[in-house]
């Protein structure tokens, strides 16, 4: 008889997910303290890590990890690779335990085995972690690292993710390291091991790594020898060239569109390497693959300097000159023409020489010399005149009588002397003190007083100490200040120290009779005193409200009758004072009181404001 309740038992052959979290790898300082103070604890911790990875490598345990444990494992791998890669070149401890070293070596091996089993995508190793992986393992395992990067080493676990080529990521990461200034010698050694280390199999990784994109990255870093990472770019391209074959180099040049020297000039770093004799020795098949490199006749001295060929012709080939101007637009036409003359109109040889050492063309001046050397009358100075003729190197007609021996032997030394002279000139000009303009005032022309605003006073006006002298000085200063204020509003740079000696500054000094220091000090006073600047702005912005028109008397400042004018004014003042002190009648008092009431607006605060402005003007004049 069947039971009242039927039980259904479901049997599932699958395994449950494994939850086995792991902590991050300890940082450098903590590891150093554990080794120094408590190495036993550090040893047990490493043994635990080793046991953990041994368990993951058994069967399909790594595939059964749940999401949380897998995330912890990925975080541990990133921290471990970062710490071990950063430990290169550092002293962890003076005396490390042998057991600790052995367990660390085992842990390093188990981790690399796990990475090869799972692949880079499953463990999410990319960017900094990928480069740290290369730094840690490429020296002893170059083949495995290359297989992980290019995707040829397939993972042994069941994963649906496609293994992609990560060479481009490595190139971009190297570019970021160089641009940020974090590229070190150990990184350069890792690149060398990655590309050129001996392997059990044919090294196809270096061939695939050397791409047109890699050349463009290095060219951008080199920046015609002026970039921040030009040294690193030069070292990287040398390692890359020595790691590939001539056939691969030929393929890359075709991709870049390089077929002659004109197109090679678009890639100056690659062009510098391709015409180098050291590269030709390492790659003897290079000239047979790249036919435009077969120039021939390249004569080099045993020293560091090139030998200059003799020039049999005196006229420049215009077609070759135009081709050089298109190829090297940074140089002038005169420089290129003189270089062609020096190399007997051999455009291929000139192009090669400029690629090898651009200073040979920079030794020539950009324009022909305008000044001609006067002939020396003495007959013993014939050799000196010959040297001067070589130095001038003007038009081709001037060089017809030059001796070939003088050109071939004297030109290199002369070029070196010119380069050295130019370098010393730039060096001393950069540190030279500013020009002393103390005695420039003696050169100012003061003969024409009509061109200046501030006029000189006569000897009589200096002797007489009455009020008219102060009024005249205030009036002159007011006009000078208005003139300078208009210039300051138009262009404040006219008051800078660098404008000394210019035509504009000379005009300012003539119009104001002020020195350079006084003009510049007036501007600095306004910069440091905004209140003073606002007062001047009010003063000269609304000056149109002042009354204009004919006056009863115009001062003749240039005449010698100023003393008589002053005396007449003094007499008028005395007569007015006498009239004021005379007794007035009642009717006159009423009339005067009515006038005062009617014009009291012009007598009270307004007069005080004018007096205050005069006082500020005098204070500013004294400050300057």
From Swiss-Prot:
Query: Which spans does this entry mark as compositional bias, Basic and acidic residues?
Result: 443-455, 568-589
Residues modified as Phosphoserine: 377
Annotated localization: Cytoplasm
- Signal sequence coordinates: none
Where does this protein have compositionally biased stretches of type Basic residues? 590-617
The UniProt keywords, alphabetically, are: Cytoplasm, Phosphoprotein
Gene Ontology cellular-component annotations: cytoplasm; cytosolic ribosome
Please classify the protein's predominant subcellular localization into one broad category: cytoplasm
Phenotype upon knockout?
Answer: Defective activation of the ribosome quality control (RQC) pathway. Mildly defective ribosome stalling induced by RNA arrest sequences. Sensitive to anisomycin (stalls ribosomes in the rotated state).
Instruction: Give the molecular function GO annotations.
Output: K63-linked polyubiquitin modification-dependent protein binding; ubiquitin binding
Q: Does the keyword Cell membrane apply?
A: no
Region Disordered: which residues? Answer: 366-390, 435-469, 546-624
GO BP terms in the entry: rescue of stalled ribosome; ribosome disassembly; ribosome-associated ubiquitin-dependent protein catabolic process
Q: Which residues form the CUE domain?
A: 316-359
Give the protein's biological function. Involved in activation of the ribosome quality control (RQC) pathway, a pathway that degrades nascent peptide chains during problematic translation. Specifically recognizes and binds RPS20/uS10 ubiquitinated by HEL2, promoting recruitment of the RQT (ribosome quality control trigger) complex on stalled ribosomes, followed by disassembly of stalled ribosomes.
PANTHER family in the record = ACTIVATING SIGNAL COINTEGRATOR 1 COMPLEX SUBUNIT 2 (PTHR21494:SF0), ACTIVATING SIGNAL COINTEGRATOR 1 COMPLEX SUBUNIT 2 ASC-1 COMPLEX SUBUNIT P100 (PTHR21494)
Q: What is the additional note?
A: Present with 6300 molecules/cell in log phase SD medium.
Domain-related comment = The CUE domain specifically binds RPS20/uS10 ubiquitinated by HEL2.
Q: What quaternary structure, including any partners, is listed in this protein's UniProt entry?
A: Component of the RQT (ribosome quality control trigger) complex, composed of SLH1, CUE3, and RQT4. Interacts with ubiquitin; the interaction is direct. Interacts with SLH1. Interacts with RQT4. Interacts with HEL2. Associates with translating ribosomes.
Protein name, please? RQC trigger complex subunit CUE3
Species annotation: Saccharomyces cerevisiae (strain ATCC 204508 / S288c) (Baker's yeast)
Tell me what gene encodes this.
CUE3
């Amino acid at each position: 008889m069947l039971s009242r309740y039927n039980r259904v038992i479901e049997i599932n052959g699958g395994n449950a997910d494994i939850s086995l979290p792991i902590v991050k790898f300890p940082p450098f300082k903590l590891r150093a303290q554990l080794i120094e103070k408590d190495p036993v604890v550090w040893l047990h911790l490493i043994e635990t890590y080793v046991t953990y990875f041994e368990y993951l490598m058994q069967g399909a345990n790594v595939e059964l990890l749940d999401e949380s444990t897998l995330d912890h494992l990925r975080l541990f791998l990133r921290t471990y690779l970062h710490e071990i890669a950063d430990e290169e070149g550092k002293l962890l401890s003076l005396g490390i335990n042998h057991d600790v070293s052995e367990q660390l070596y085992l842990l390093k091996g188990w981790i690399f085995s796990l990475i090869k089993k799972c692949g880079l995508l499953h463990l999410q190793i990319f960017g900094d972690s990928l480069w740290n992986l290369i730094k840690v393992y490429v020296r002893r395992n170059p083949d495995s690292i290359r297989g992980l990067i290019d995707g040829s080493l397939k993972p042994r676990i069941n994963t649906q993710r496609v293994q992609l080529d990560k060479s481009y990521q490595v190139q971009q990461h190297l570019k970021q390291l160089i641009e940020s200034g974090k590229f070190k010698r150990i990184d350069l050694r890792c690149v060398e091991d990655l590309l050129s280390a001996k392997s059990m199999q044919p090294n196809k990784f270096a061939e695939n790594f050397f791409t047109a994109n890699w050349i463009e990255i290095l060219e951008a870093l080199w920046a015609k020898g002026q970039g921040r990472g030009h040294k690193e770019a030069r070292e990287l391209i040398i390692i890359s060239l020595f790691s590939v074959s001539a056939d691969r180099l030929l393929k890359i040049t075709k991709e870049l569109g390089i077929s002659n020297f004109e197109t090679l000039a678009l890639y100056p770093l690659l062009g510098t390497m391709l015409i180098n004799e050291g590269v030709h020795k390492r790659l003897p098949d290079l000239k047979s693959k790249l036919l435009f490199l077969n120039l021939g006749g390249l004569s080099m001295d045993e020293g560091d300097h090139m030998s200059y060929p003799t020039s049999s012709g005196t006229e420049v080939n215009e077609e070759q000159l135009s081709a050089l101007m298109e190829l090297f637009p940074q140089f002038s036409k005169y420089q290129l023409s003189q270089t062609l003359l020096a190399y007997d109109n051999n455009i291929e040889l000139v192009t090669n020489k400029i690629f090898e050492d651009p200073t040979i063309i920079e030794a020539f001046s950009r324009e022909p010399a305008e000044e001609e050397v006067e002939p020396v009358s003495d007959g013993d100075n014939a050799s000196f005149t010959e040297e001067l003729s070589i130095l001038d190197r003007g038009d081709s007609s001037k060089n017809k009588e030059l001796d070939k021996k003088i050109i071939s032997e004297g030109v290199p030394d002369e070029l070196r002397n010119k380069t050295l002279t130019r370098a010393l000139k730039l060096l001393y000009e950069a540190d030279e003190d500013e020009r002393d303009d103390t005695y420039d005032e003696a050169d100012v022309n003061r003969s024409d007083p009509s061109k200046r605003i501030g006029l000189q006073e006569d000897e009589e006006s200096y002797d007489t100490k009455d009020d008219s002298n102060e009024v005249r000085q205030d009036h002159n200063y007011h006009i000078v200040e208005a003139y300078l204020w208009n210039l300051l509003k138009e262009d404040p740079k006219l008051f800078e120290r660098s404008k000394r000696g210019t035509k504009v500054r000379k005009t300012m000094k003539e119009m104001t009779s002020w020195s350079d220091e006084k003009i510049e000090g007036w501007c600095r006073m306004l910069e440091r005193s905004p209140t003073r600047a606002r007062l001047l702005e009010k003063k000269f912005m609304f000056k149109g409200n002042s009354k204009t028109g004919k006056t009863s008397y115009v001062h003749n400042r240039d005449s010698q009758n100023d003393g008589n004018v002053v005396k007449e004014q003094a007499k008028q003042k005395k007569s007015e004072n006498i009239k004021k002190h005379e007794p007035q009648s009642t009717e006159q008092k009423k009339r005067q009181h009515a006038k005062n009431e009617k014009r009291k607006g012009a007598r009270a605060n307004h007069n005080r404001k004018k007096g205050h402005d005069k006082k500020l003007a005098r204070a500013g004049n004294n400050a300057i």
